[in-house]
Structures are given as C-alpha cells and as structure tokens.
Amino acid sequence: MFKARICGWIGLLPLFMLSLPVQAELRCVANAVDIEQFFSAATAEDKQQVEQAINSSVNLVPFGLSASDWKVHRGDLVVEGNIESNQKLIVLGNLTVKGNISTFSLSNPWVILGNVTATNIVTDSPLLIAGSINASGLVFIDSYYDNPSTIKGSINARGIFINDIIAPVVASSTNSEFMVRASDKNDTENVKKALMIINPDAYYWGLINDEDALKEIFKRSNIRMAGNVCNQMKKEALFRPKPSPELVQELQML
C-alpha cells in the first residue's frame, strides 16, 4: 500500500539524521566560474558606501564590516555561468548571474547594494541585499547562529524555502508559487505546494503520512534538506516535471 511505503520512510528518518553531520559547508553548483578576478580588497571608502546606502535601516553589527578580509566589486557585476563562494563579498551595485548561485560559508556574509538575479540560489551565508532577489527557479536561504539575513526589497522566485529557526530572515515581500518558512510549522498549505513542485530527490525522507509529519517536514531537517537541494541543483533537476497521481491523491487527503 502507498501508506505503508511512506511510513517505512518516516520510520528510518531518525537514524538517517543521526548519520549526517550537524554542520557542513554546502557546495551546490557544477562548473563554477572563478569570481576572484572580479573582486579586490575592500577599502574603508567601500565600507562607508555600504553604511551610507543602508542608512541605519539595518543593523550592520552582525556583518562585521571592520574585518580586513572583505572583497568588493565596484559597480554592477554580470557573470556568465554558475558561481559559488565562501568569502565575505560586497557588490556595490546589481549582481546578475546567468546561472546558479551557491554561498557555502556559515558565517561570511554577502552584501549587495542592488538587486540579485539568478536561476536558482542556495545560500548558507548571511545576506544583506539592498534591492530584491529575482530567481526563475528556487531560492533557499539557511540562517545559522546569530547571523540574520535581510532583503530590503522582495524575493521573487518559483519557490522559496527559508530556514529561519535559529536566525531571522527578513524580506519586504515575496512572490512565488510557494513560500515555506521552517519557523511556521502550521503552514501546511505551502508545504503541500512545495511537495507538488519540487523533485522528491530534494527531500530525503520520502513523503509524509499524516498532518503532524507534514507540519514538521522542514523544521526537523534544514541542513540535511539543504544538502539534497544542492545535489539536485548540480543536476539541474530541482523541479519535477509533473506530480504523480499518487502524490496528488495523498496530499488531497491531508
């Protein structure tokens, strides 16, 4: 029976979670463009420009602008292909990536003083974006420790996952087919929408068998789910072409 198969997956979940690392730096793109060539050491004037642009509307203390290892690109930046980085980066303009974006540091922020445009975005790094995020696919934002993420504009994407259990992720608005926040375990409708659209290989636990499991589906996973999302992004296979009739029926019953 369909239910029995689902229950079997759920029963294995605790053991599988224990076998995985609590923290990891996720690298989510294939054939990444070397972006070192576009950046140089940030000066005091660059950091002052960030402070003036934000104009005290965001608390910059968690971003530690006084650190010496910030890299900067002055003006708009357009990259042909996928990018990834674990460094502290500032873009004094718009960032347009004709591919996917992956940031795989748990503590090194990205500060963008314009809009960010890409296909898919998976980030472990704290974000401070003065404009909006525009993605034709998925935006997956993980927050760790005490490092918040702030998007002063909107997040526009086909799907949005936000893991904000440990640290807040703030955006002025969102526009998507689904938007799941890990902190809101009662929002089962958006979880159902996500399960209809996302490739099932992007969530290792299989499906779900009751509403209680549905409410916890992202809260109890976060980084483990992020790892599978990374794998599917590398394969350019984040979204399913069409949900199976069995899945449609299963979700309608919840």
Model-derived features: positions:
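N-terminal domain-start segments of secreted/luminal proteins
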Residues: 26-103
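Extracellular beta-strand solenoids
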Residues: 72-73, 79, 84-85, 91-92, ...
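Acidic (E/D-rich), amphipathic helical modules within compact regulatory domains
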Residues: 108
